[in-house]
Amino acid sequence: MIIVHGLLSLSLKGYKKWIHWLNEQGWNGVLMHLPYHFQRKSPSLLFSARCVQPNLVHTMETLRQSVMDLYTFTRGLRRVGSPLIAGWGISYGAWTISQLCSFDDTLHKLILVEPLLHVHYVIWQSPAGKEIRKKLTRLGITPSETYPHLRLACPSLSKPKLDGQDILIVGGLYDKISPPWILKEIKEKWKVDHLFFFPVGHLNNTLTSKSFKLALECWKDDFSLSHD
């Protein structure tokens, strides 16, 4: 299981806990460190917001680097003989791993927790994009000008190379960054079998445990210690 963290993640503690849980289910787990996070940021910074900023070219280049890192790693796992490779991503991490799945079929299962799938909405309408759109507007850049350039960077405009039965999406009913209506539209477009909502907002820690437990229910055979 490849775990892809969210934007501005500060601690590895919670992720290590869930990797240990995966080990108990018979899975290996690894946490990908995205650009400008953990060992990939300046030691003088507590965290870095450089992944997403008003400089949209830089934002897209950072996303591309994240996706290529994932691509290289998953291909490496396949070459050494991993029989089943799954991906779990939350928020920005879910955006990244969804982009990988739009052109690569290495992953067999995909778990997305409050994923950022409609990038245009995130930038121009969500609370998270307030400062970005303020600066873009100051530069005279409009939504109609940015939309065409998101074609290769927005999961809502593509489709993963997985069957719908192999995708699990978990969202928050009060999430204003990845709202239910967007996830419901994605469910229809991607023909996703497993979509669940809980009464929480964005980046609620309880959804991590809920997502893994739902995966255990949805794909019981794949998480069985005896399936080998």
PLM features: residue spans?
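Gly/Ala-rich beta-loop-alpha elbow adjacent to hydrolase catalytic centers
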Residues: 88-97
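The feature captures the conserved acid-bearing segment of alpha/beta-hydrolase catalytic domains
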Residues: 122-188
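Conserved alpha/beta-hydrolase fold motif
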Residues: 85-87, 110
